[in-house]
Amino acid sequence: MTTTVDPHAALRDRVYRTLFDGPGESDPALRRTVAENGAVPPDLAAVVDKIHRHAYKVTDEDIARLRASYSDDQLFEIVVSAAVGASRIRLAAGLAALESA
């Protein structure tokens, strides 16, 4: 088995640090938890889960409900964090599969 060196790991890690730990309108801890599909506030749980599992199922109504509690900037950061987190999980699974092949 050959160990694959990921030439893009450093750049990806920089993007993750900026997105999850950088300044923003939403709390960095919330962005990180959303990315990990962890225990988010109840009002976010359904949308975050949809983004992680079936992003195409998120509706305008889902977002409209969240606008009562979150600004557009906060919602943008939350949605992007969930999407990047979901892709990160899938990438890790894919790289692990390649390593074990």
What name fits each language-model region?
Residues 1-101:
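Hydrophobic alpha-helical segments
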